């Protein structure tokens, strides 16, 4: 599904990501954790083609993001850490805009928008300007837009920030359903309890370098993920 080999990205003399390699297989929810500035967002933006990286290779279903970015982007969805996008649109205009980009048919988009807007209790707000949305409403809109074209791979940067408990529960269910159907999820989070309960695998990044990765048992053993993370951060 997603293969990252020796990814390196520098800003001037500082390496934001340094020789990072990971593989996310179909059916996996893969968590990506690290302190602020560790390189998580740079990695995610490199995967989805927003940032040009200096060296290494990223492939999605064997397709290089550098060689054929459009083919890769058709297979993925990306939820950034800041959902403040296209605020001049209404909610429904934005969702239709995303559906247009991915060539979703009128019937399919209508059905999917209705399904997810009802789930997230956003139906009555779709005609409103996005500028009037709360942070949580913008995050829900971003989630709906990510699922609208049924991507193979969903990349998310801190997706639970701003969500109420009900919406968080719904998102977790959608993530598991996506993977049960052969898709994959790769997401960053600071909520270690969520990562520990939800993820099949997890990677810990520090100073741009991968310091531990694997199944939850491989990463944490008999300890809590929080204890392991804090111990590694202190080294």
Residue ranges and their predicted role:
Residues 96, 100, 107-125:
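Conserved ABC ATPase "signature" region
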Residues 154-158:
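Catalytic Walker B motif of ABC-type/P-loop ATPase nucleotide-binding domains
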Residues 168-181:
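Helical segment within the ABC ATPase nucleotide-binding domain
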Residues 213-214:
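ABC ATPase "signature
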Residues 56-67, 71-72:
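Conserved ABC transporter NBD signature motif
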